[in-house]
Design a protein with these regions (language model features):
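N-terminal module-boundary/linker segments of secreted carbohydrate-active enzymes
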Residues: 17-80
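Domain-level detector of nuclease and nuclease-like folds
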Residues: 87-216
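Sec-dependent N-terminal signal peptides
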Residues: 4-13
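Alpha-helical transmembrane segments and their juxtamembrane interfaces
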Residues: 12-16, 107
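Short secondary-structure junctions and interdomain/linker hinges
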Residues: 11, 45-49, 80, 134, ...
């Protein structure tokens, strides 16, 4: 038992040290210098194939109350994690690009070779109808309540904006800010920018900044 406890202590201490040192180069920085250094830290994230992201989401969005299920980001519904919609089956799940791939045109050419397209930090499980309803809309408060089939959701939508349920607003905002920081136009990648107000695709922008800051 002592050996197990000692090993656990070493592992925990090592992980804490790694976490502490991860941002060490940012100490004393602010403004654009801080942003540039944060970008340098995260720009070499490990890329996975688009197929592999299904496995990642099955783990990342697992239903803690039912490990066989996955939680859908916009409805909060729990469904079988292996019910993946290969042909847009209405009761199955597929992958939502939270920063829409059309906002930056990073689905052009062979999208499966584009890091921004396959970046698991930007993917969430949704059902087909909610994926279609959200589409390329910017994030903003307000609109009409969203029905998923005959079921009422806690989301709201207009012709140009989408408001997710309260429980995931912070997650959504941080995913968007990650994409803004990670993809700055280097090595042929898109230069993604969060802006105030509404945007038009394929411009590499998404809104609305003040609302996303509020959600964060």
């Amino acid at each position: 038992m002592k050996k197990v406890f000692y090993l656990f202590t070493i592992i925990s201490t090592t992980l804490m040290a790694q976490t502490t040192n991860y941002y060490e180069s940012c100490n004393g920085l602010s403004g654009e210098a801080l942003r540039a250094e944060l970008h340098n830290i995260i720009k070499d994230h490990q890329s996975f194939s688009y197929t592999t992201t299904k496995t990642i989401l099955r783990e990342a969005d697992e239903d803690y109350n039912n490990p066989d299920n996955i939680i859908l980001v916009y409805t909060g519904n729990s469904i079988d994690k292996f019910d993946f919609a290969s042909n847009f089956e209405p009761d199955f799940w597929n992958r939502e690009h939270v920063w829409p791939k059309s906002h930056g045109d990073f689905d052009a050419g062979d999208p499966f070779e584009v890091p921004a397209y396959t970046d698991a930090h930007n993917l969430k499980p949704v059902d087909h109808s909610m994926n279609t309803l959200r589409g390329e809309k910017d994030f903003e408060n307000g609109g009409d309540v969203v029905f998923n089939g005959s079921s009422l959701t806690d989301c709201f939508s207009t012709n140009s904006t989408f408001e997710p349920r309260n429980e995931v607003k912070g997650d959504i905002a941080r995913m968007i800010f990650y994409m803004d920081l990670r993809y700055e136009g280097g090595s042929g990648e898109p230069n993604l920018v969060v802006v105030e107000g509404l945007t038009t695709y394929p411009n590499p922008q998404i809104g609305s900044l003040s609302t996303l800051l509020e959600w964060h």
